[in-house]
Amino acid sequence: MIVTNDKQIYERAMALKDFGREIGVKKQMEKSFSHSTIGYNFKFTEFQAAVGIAQMRKLEKRILKKRSMFRKYVDLLSNVKGIEFLKTNLKNVTPWMIDIFLKSSVKRTQLIKYLEKKQIGTRIYYPPIHRLKPYRDTDQEYKQASSFSDRGLWLPSSVTLTDKQIVIICNQIKQFFK
């Protein structure tokens, strides 16, 4: 779902979701197969649109919760040696996932196993694109992308988490690093 008040973004999104056709072209039969760009069949059903509208009503509350969670994690873990957070300006960004970066991939694997034993789920960071099958035929190393991917870890970040649960998670992480 895209929400915008920018006419250019709106028109581009409408074209992309309708096979690349410009707005209004469908109504003109002779131009209905005129495509100005590559597009896709991304049209919502009425049911999907209704669910999207209902979710939009919750958006502001979720944004506030996600920002609050991020602040809590940073407050509790920023002094732990071996953990880094990306610098995040919460005025412009809503961290949907709470990601931390460890000094090494070995430490990350150890932390994952430790937290699993404590019944705290985590997820490894996205693999860099150059490691995905369609892009492997390259001589480039992409050291920065590999480093971020190998050291990155997502902490629990559901909007249903309570402050108390975040404190428990952070205490376990601190215990691991002692």
Language model features with spans:
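Glycine-rich phosphate-binding loop of ATP-grasp-fold ATP-dependent ligases
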Residues: 1-2
